[in-house]
Design a protein with these regions (language model features):
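Conserved, mostly hydrophobic/aromatic
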Residues: 45, 72, 94, 126, ...
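Active-site loop/helix belt of alpha/beta enzymes
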Residues: 2-3, 165-392, 465, 492, ...
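The start of beta-strands in P-loop NTPase/AAA+ ATPase cores
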Residues: 89, 132, 156, 281, ...
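Solvent-exposed alpha-helices and their adjacent loops that cap or buttress functional pockets
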Residues: 103-106, 127-128, 150-153, 175, ...
Length: 526
């Protein structure tokens, strides 16, 4: 049983008050593998990966689902094997990530290449290894991929990343579907009235023609009527009085015409033009990160389905797949919200089914890319406590609950922003517990800080810890399985900690600790 719901499934507290991982105490892990230390419950990784794959399939039971693990969250050969054995593909976005996954024995057909600035070498490797998808991120990229594929005598599978205009995610840096950022191609032309897309919200109220409806059948659905309107509008854009259509159909036709004029459709046409060497497999949308419910996913999905419908109307090609990206939230502190996966995926599935039926389109393959959700709660970072320094505060100081405070204890540990940059970069909140003993019942307001020459070197901004916390204690910070090791740095020439895999079977090093010799070997100056 986990220490609390935010801790790894294999964690517990023994009779002595020590935190354990599959029976191994935190103290024993530090003694064997060193401090600081990333601990990953690999049994929990496997369970969570399997859970997402099954939940997606259950929710979207009228179509095929694919789930890819976002390798940027945590990547090693062992993690690659675990998630692929659990039914996932793996998203990569650099040569390093690609080579690690391939070295783990993952076949190219289980890999995806993302990236807003792919090198020719990365594209060539993806094509040579037969990657499941190369996600196009900008208008000039299809021609580059086509040229490389032609030179290699192969056909590349490609998908277009679209910025839907739906904003989600807690911090600006992790909200990725608004137009003013580096990823993807915009759905709508500059200056377009996005409110016209609100017609999609009414489609679920229309009597559907059925999920397998095809265009051209005897009884037209609203989507078919709108398609005829769209085809006419493209030919005669200034006259909409040629036939009597309902207001809803007219609004849908206007929305489709607007999408038809957008950059995304133009890039889809460019990809399709190279169909001798490029296989167009679908569209991709990633709206942000750490999102608590399906609302924004639903809006983005509706827009992707409208793009899919519009491309069918203009080019008679049905995009096989729609990738809805990642961003599914986890709780970082006790009491914090996290996504109810089954409930929210069911809501998303209902919305996707309804809009496709109303548009008269067959259901596409639906894909997801959970990274944080898969591994964040499986990881804990262990530190050794050093300096413990009480600081007197001004009379106006308050804690985050609004209570007046006169003292804060600064608890310094032997790591910091070099092994967890997220608090400094995003203002992310974490919690902590003494892991080697029970501690006193009396607590004090503490701030856990690192060892770096930086005032922003904060690991946990505010937490109540036992008043008797002291030098030499082991401090555990949970929910660090995602973006701890992968965003680690050598700031102040600190050594990046080891990653240890703990399971019912054993505890072993997954990624070794850096050494001073590594730093000296990299420095080749005289």
């Amino acid at each position: 049983m986990a220490v609390t719901p935010i801790w790894p499934a294999g964690s517990d507290v023994n009779e002595q008050g020590e935190i354990t991982f599959h029976g191994r105490t935190a103290e024993s892990l530090l003694n064997e593998f060193g401090s600081p230390l990333y601990v990953i419950d690999t049994d929990d990784v496997r369970a969570r990966a399997t859970k997402f794959v099954k939940s997606a399939a259950n929710a979207f039971n009228n179509t095929v689902t694919h789930v890819s693990f976002a390798g940027k969250a945590l990547l090693s050969k062992e993690i690659c094997r675990i998630v692929t054995e659990s039914g996932m593909l793996i998203d990569t976005c650099t040569m390093g990530e690609m080579r690690i996954a391939l070295a783990a024995g993952v076949p190219g057909r289980r890999l995806v290449l993302h990236g807003n600035n792919k090198s020719d070498a990365e594209i060539e490797l993806a094509i040579t290894e037969g990657f499941a998808k190369i996600v196009v991120d900008e208008p000039n990229e299809p021609a580059r991929i086509a040229e490389i594929a032609k030179r290699l005598g192969k056909r590349a599978r490609v998908m277009l990343r679209v910025t839907s205009g739906i904003h989600a995610g807690g911090h600006e840096f992790v909200s990725t579907a608004h137009e003013d950022q580096k990823f993807g191609v915009a759905l709508l032309p500059v200056g377009a009235d996005a409110s016209k897309l609100n017609v999609l919200d009414d489609l679920a109220d229309v009597t559907p023609a059925g999920s397998n409806a095809r265009l051209g059948e005897s009884e037209a659905t609203p989507g078919e009527s709108a398609e005829r309107q769209l085809q006419y509008d493209i030919k005669y854009p200034y006259d909409m009085s040629h036939e009597k259509v309902s207001e809803g159909d007219r609004q849908l036709a206007e929305a489709m015409t607007m999408v038809a004029d957008g950059p995304a459709l133009a890039v889809l046409k460019e990809i399709y033009r190279h169909q001798d060497v490029l296989e167009l497999v679908g569209v991709h949308s990633h709206i942000g990160s750490n999102i608590h419910d399906a609302d924004a996913f639903i809006q983005a999905a509706k827009r992707m389905m409208l793009l899919r419908k519009t491309f069918y109307a203009t080019d008679a090609y049905t995009l096989p797949e729609v990738d809805l990206g990642g961003g599914y939230s986890v709780a970082y502190t006790d009491g914090e919200d996290s996504m109810d996966l089954d409930t929210e995926l069911a809501r998303l599935a209902d919305a996707v089914t309804a809009v496709n039926r109303a548009l008269g389109m067959p259901a596409p393959v639906i894909s997801f890319e959970p990274g944080r959700w898969t591994v964040a709660p499986t990881g804990v970072t262990l530190y050794r406590v050093g300096t413990v320094k009480p600081v007197q505060l001004a009379g106006t100081a308050k804690d985050k609950a609004g209570n007046p405070v006169t003292e804060r204890v600064y608890v310094s540990v032997d790591g910091g922003m070099s092994d967890n940059i997220r608090p400094a970069l995003y203002g992310s909140d974490y919690t902590a517990k003494i892991a080697n003993r029970e501690g006193s019942s009396e607590t004090k307001l503490c701030r856990v800080v690192g060892m770096h020459c930086e005032s922003g070197d904060i690991i946990v901004n505010e937490v109540r810890l036992p008043a008797d916390i002291q030098r030499g204690d082991v401090l555990a910070v949970p929910v660090t399985g995602a973006y701890g090791r992968t965003m680690a740095s050598n700031y102040n020439q600190a050594l990046i900690p080891a990653v240890v895999a703990v399971s019912e079977q054993d505890a072993h090093v997954m990624i070794r600790r850096q050494t001073v010799d590594d730093l000296l070997d990299w420095d080749v100056s005289e």
